[in-house]
Amino acid sequence: MIQILSFLPLLAVTLGQAEPKAAANDAVREEQVRFLKEQAAELALHGAGDSKTTFTLGSPLLRYSNWAGLSSDGATFLWLSGARPVAVVSLSIRRPNNAVYRECSSLWPSGLDCRQGQASVWSPKRGGLLAQPLNDAPPAAEGDAQRLAQMRQIARRFQVTWHHSRTDEQTQLRMLSTPIYRFAAENEGIVDGGLFAFVITNDPEMLLLVEAVRKKPGEAGGWQYSLARMSSLKEVVRLDDREIWSVLNYHQDSTDDRKTGPYSEQKTGTYTPAAGGSGNKPQ
């Protein structure tokens, strides 16, 4: 008992030291997410050649850290047309020098124009792999919970590998079992939809959109899928162990236009923490 009691003051001191450290870490994370939100809010997405059509940017769908890669802090946002996903933007602060990177990926069948102020920073002509039918999937169920179970079963049929830029070593990405976004747009024939993320740690590297679609009222809904890359590395996607899509290393592919392709990665500056406030603008 004496030994236990003599340990208690040391434990109290240790816990007392841990609390300010945890509070400081929370404050840093709050500052960083505020900065990432500010950066996202500076972007406006329109239809190509149609500045009057502005898509809505939502709150962060996912907050992530990728200690297996470079990102120390990041957030993923989604542009919407009504409830439908249009495009994705991830903003991250990366080690070792707090470089700020912006990744954009289109899920839209036609052209887009992403602007920061008056400058066009990304103008994809098309999305990734879009609206591919899943003819062998069972008809969409009537209930929400049953359809969610179906979407998860469909998503588990996909495997995504990520290839190291120098060694080509493969890493299989992990699928988050809960969609990061779920929606319906029945006036556009989409009964239900879920956006699934394939991740390293919890950093999305590939997105899979699974949708239950119905062409006519009253008919049984079928299923379709779309894919959007969220990594500059080479990636290969398989469905039931059969390769269906691959993308080359973004920085080694001379055939892909950096500004008009469906995916873009850009360094936008450096994050500098401001004491007692939000991070500075990228320098």
State each model region's role.
Residues 56-92, 179-206, 210:
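Exposed beta-strand-loop-beta-strand "reactive/processing" segments of non-cytosolic proteins
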Residues 3-24:
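Bacterial Sec-dependent signal peptides at the C-terminal "C-region" and cleavage site
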Residues 19-52, 65, 92-186, 206-283:
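Polybasic, proline/glycine-rich intrinsically disordered low-complexity segments
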